């Protein structure tokens, strides 16, 4: 099944890390810029949206956030994008609160996304706690200071204001759960799947004719030449 999740790039390093984690678990994701309109995401056939932001403590600039919400697609907002989601839903943010050491984060393991996950911890110099009316959201990630994660009411939409980490099992579990349990994606993305897909696209573009492949000497063009040869021969 050729399903995919779209990762909206709001912070380069955070976006790359999340995309790498998803692909390592064999879930296909496509990275798009924050200027990508909701209708473009729908045309891709995406099953879900991940907003990949950093953790600066300021709400991220997400130009089409309301449009994304109106698609009805499942959405996972991470880092500063969760602060933006909170405000968009009518919530409020605390002033930055300095943190002394790691924050112990209590998770509601009964939530469909968290799926039995155990409590975790995060180190951030400061935190901004989110506040939403009970009718708007359910807290699912909290510390003694307040709410750091929520599930929006009547929507498959989640926000976590803390960062996901590269070598953290919780981060991988969260992303996989979003793709598998919420979006209904299958783990089909492998090296062979990439090769097969590229061969099909090249063969379709050539349409039974010939094709010219120009080599620059770089890795990308070399890979393209190999794929072209696999698809239509010499």
Task: Specify the residue positions occupied by each region the protein language model found.
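Short alpha-beta junction capping motif
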Residues: 61-81
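RNA-binding accessory domains that recognize and position tRNA/RNA substrates
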Residues: 1-51, 55-60, 69-71, 87-234
